[in-house]
UniProtKB/Swiss-Prot annotation:
Changing residue 185 to K: In allele APOA-IV*3. GO terms for biological process: acylglycerol homeostasis; cholesterol efflux; cholesterol homeostasis; cholesterol metabolic process; chylomicron assembly; chylomicron remodeling; high-density lipoprotein particle remodeling; hydrogen peroxide catabolic process. Nine of the thirteen 22-amino acid tandem repeats (each 22-mer is actually a tandem array of two, A and B, related 11-mers) occurring in this sequence are predicted to be highly alpha-helical, and many of these helices are amphipathic. They may therefore serve as lipid-binding domains with lecithin:cholesterol acyltransferase (LCAT) activating abilities. Changing residue 44 to K: In Budapest-2. Residues 1-20 form the signal peptide. This is Apolipoprotein A-IV. Homodimer. Changing residue 66 to V: In ADTKD6; likely pathogenic. Belongs to the apolipoprotein A1/A4/E family. Its main location: secreted. Transmembrane segments: none annotated. Phosphorylation sites are present in the extracellular medium. It is found in: Secreted.
Length: 396
């Protein structure tokens, strides 16, 4: 079934937003991945897809948010699903129309740049090399920081395992009272260190976005002399490039955060296992503590190996996108699917607008409800005063 194809997307979204409200970016990501998968499927397969599948995916975002005292998530879900379904149905029509418009735009832009094809290609190549030079230090720093933070995390947690083994040897008669505080402290230390790790790694994505803005602006200036009467079309193409590159930066941040949360979820059961064995026999506890240090090292090392290449992979993706721009603007572009990034940008803009409007209305509704609450309080006070006045003659 097609839903299996988006399990990874939903899992990443769920981990990244497990402690926060459902966001516009999460909703747009689910919608875009769903649309992309439909576009990539054979027509026969698409015809068999149930229209309810998008609704199921969106509802999955809310499954952990419903049932709370705050009704925000429930109200948002009721209004969002119909909006998203209608917006998705329009995407296919908008896609064909936009593809035609972007195709014409690129034709005019290529025709204008054709007399300067070699110079344009050279400028983009120069800009590409400058981009690589700017990003390489940050990718190296990210790799180093991942290794440093992983080692620091290991150094922070390993002593707890060693300390609990020592306490086990010295306090065999009162294990629960002696070890429980250490097991609780280990769990708290895991949470604290994972949050610190995320705080040190995720800002690199923002640094990358700053460099993207600088690079694209320099490219705009270098190509401007060759596109004097088609500057607006060139700007539009560069906006699409910027969107793609910054999307990669946001995905990098989300992947780092999701990997850190996955590390937390892998480490937490180790502390819980120790706490659970406190109620069992000494032999089981000894085995659990003996294996704890090795398990901690293993999970931290797996995190390091998985996350270290993120920076280099991000750089490669940006280089590829810059090369695609050079191909689109070149004389031998062929049939390039250049409209999809603009379609996705439009989708995300519409979803962001929906969320902004919804939150503004929610805020207005809360503001309007305050006078009603005050009026109810005044009525209650008047009723209490009337009751006191009615009782006064009886007391006399």
């Amino acid at each position: 079934m097609f839903l299996k194809a988006v399990v990874l997307t939903l899992a990443l979204v769920a981990v990244a937003g497990a402690r926060a409200e459902v966001s516009a970016d999460q909703v747009a990501t689910v919608m875009w991945d769903y649309f992309s998968q439909l576009s990539n499927n054979a027509k026969e397969a698409v015809e068999h897809l149930q229209k309810s599948e998008l609704t199921q995916q969106l509802n999955a975002l809310f499954q952990d948010k419903l049932g709370e005292v705050n009704t925000y998530a429930g109200d948002l879900q009721k209004k969002l699903v119909p909006f998203a379904t209608e917006l998705h149905e329009r995407l296919a029509k908008d896609s064909e129309k936009l593809k035609e418009e972007i195709g014409k735009e690129l034709e005019e832009l290529r025709a204008r740049l054709l007399p300067h094809a070699n110079e344009v290609s050279q400028k983009i190549g120069d800009n590409l090399r400058e981009l690589q030079q700017r990003l390489e230090p940050y990718a190296d720093q990210l790799r180093t920081q991942v290794s440093t933070q992983a080692e620091q995390l290991r150094r922070q947690l390993t002593p707890y395992a060693q300390r609990m083994e020592r306490v086990l040897r010295e306090n065999a008669d009162s294990l629960q009272a002696s070890l429980r505080p250490h097991a609780d402290e280990l769990k708290a230390k895991i949470d604290q260190n994972v949050e610190e790790l995320k705080g040190r790694l995720t800002p690199y994505a923002d640094e990358f976005k700053v460099k993207i803005d600088q690079t694209v602006e320099e490219l705009r200036r270098s190509l401007a002399p060759y596109a004097q009467d088609t500057q607006e079309k060139l700007n539009h193409q560069l906006e699409g490039l910027t969107f793609q590159m910054k999307k990669n930066a946001e995905e990098l941040k989300a992947r780092i955060s999701a990997s850190a949360e996955e590390l937390r979820q892998r480490l937490a059961p180790l502390a819980e296992d120790v706490r659970g064995n406190l109620r069992g026999n000494t032999e089981g506890l000894q085995k659990s503590l003996a294996e704890l240090g090795g398990h901690l090292d293993q999970q931290v090392e797996e995190f390091r190996r998985r996350v270290e290449p993120y920076g280099e992979n991000f750089n490669k993706a940006l280089v590829q996108q810059m090369e695609q721009l050079r191909q689109k603007l070149g004389p031998h572009a062929g049939d390039v699917e250049g409209h999809l990034s603009f379609l996705e940008k439009d989708l995300r803009d519409k979803v962001n607008s929906f969320f902004s409007t919804f939150k503004e209305k929610e805020s207005q509704d809360k503001t309007l409800s305050l006078p009603e609450l005050e009026q109810q309080q005044e009525q209650q006070q008047e009723q209490q005063q009337e009751q006191v006045q009615m009782l006064a003659p009886l007391e006399s």
